[in-house]
């Protein structure tokens, strides 16, 4: 895969916002490194930018920002923290859904967060690929300029957006993009759902987001999974 081919995987509606912010060389280097990877890469290449396909730039109301895809076959589906229905539920998903159930109905057996993405929640990771069996294995492969550009594109849109960075890499990415909690955007950082310190469990992030939206006289986000 060439750099141009990699860039061509980005949905057209997002390309215009990213053009000029990520040098061509960055795409070329990233494509080369991905091509040199000897292990299986998750998810499949057609799903690397799935988050952008499902949630258009103009439709983004919130961004849940994670670290990287699941390194187990069949679990990564191109949406941060989401697992196809019918797959084993990772502990991180279990914890996320337990918190979401404080706000809305979560049907038993649901693990895919696709309905959230369709409602304007961009489910993005700071790194969009992972080698089989090694979480964080592509953290330094070159995705950072691309995902940073995506965050800046969202932040530059008119209207308020809620940014929910979960984990240190996600919080750092929001900081690099210059996104601040203030009069326009809402930033609700948290530990990663798998972290033991500063427990995600019981933190009610979804209720907090909806309360912040209420204060801005904006519609709440529907976190249900029917």
Over which residues does each language-model region extend?
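Sequence termini and other peripheral, non-core segments
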Residues: 1-3
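A polyanion-binding, active-site-adjacent surface
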Residues: 12-212, 219-226
